Amino acid sequence: MSEAPVLIAKDARGVATVTINRPNVRNAIDDTVIGLLTDAFTGLGVDGATRIVVLTGSGSAFCAGADLGWMRRMAAAGERENVASAKTISAMLRSLNELPKPTIARVNGAAYAAGTGLVAACDIAVAVEQAVFSISEVRIGLTPSTISPYVVAAIGARAARRYFLTGEPFSAADASRLGLVHQVVAESALDGAVESLIATLLAGGPQSQSRAKRLIADVAGRPVDDALEMLTARSIADARASPEGREGIQAFLDKRKPAWR
């Protein structure tokens, strides 16, 4: 396998697989990897040929969090450098969370700290049975600050109180119960489960999926009031009037597959 720390592979269907490729350090991330991931997510988001993005890790781990050498350098750095560094992590997670295509976390093993944050920032997560998760920052005197918006959105504030404060590891089964992952499978079934999700996602309209992601962000946590009613009314009206919406409705009436399939 290439020694590049981040790999991007795209197939004819428009499925892009982004792989954190540092198996010797369990795919821990440093400033270089963070920059490469941000560029990958941003670039794939505007690539019209990309339909779906799958995020995974090389070897037996998904992502073991921050690289120890990088953490050591940051511990010796000043406040300004630390703030700038933390903002790059925030920007990476945000670029993944706001990527206007469906994203799948293919969790092939351990996901610690920032690794858990990457899982939470994906739309759908599938994990192997032996995967272990941990929001472990407090155990080394830190806080899970940059990942917190995504992890709290995934597991809720109540569960976050436990796992943010204890830093204890939890299993894939617990991650499923908490809502962090959607499906837990045997290691041998991981690729099949991801492929099944890909096939299901490819059946949807790409523009409607992008709109659906924006809609979730717009309505989550908001009270149902006149402004929200208008937002949702405009959303469906715009979708109906769009070329993709018209094609989808006509294909349904004609009992044929829409053009995007």
Q: PLM features: what roles do these ranges have?
A:
Residues S60-A64, A111-A113, S134, I216, ...:
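Short, active-site-adjacent cap segments at secondary-structure transitions
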Residues R94-Q209, S242, R256:
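Crotonase-fold acyl-CoA enzyme core
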Residues A40, T88-L99:
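Catalytic-core regions built around general acid/base machinery
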Residues M1-S58, R94, D191:
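Conserved CoA-thioester-binding segment of acyl-CoA-metabolizing enzymes
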Residues Y163-F164, L215-V219, R234-R240:
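Helix-loop "lid/cap" segments that line or gate small-molecule binding pockets
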Residues M1-T17, N21, P169-L202, S210-A220, ...:
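Amphipathic alpha-helical segments at domain termini/boundaries
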Residues V18, R22, L36-L37, L55, ...:
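Terminal peptide-recognition signature
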Residues A49, G57-L93, A111, P223:
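Glycine- (often His-adjacent) and acidic-residue-rich active-site loop
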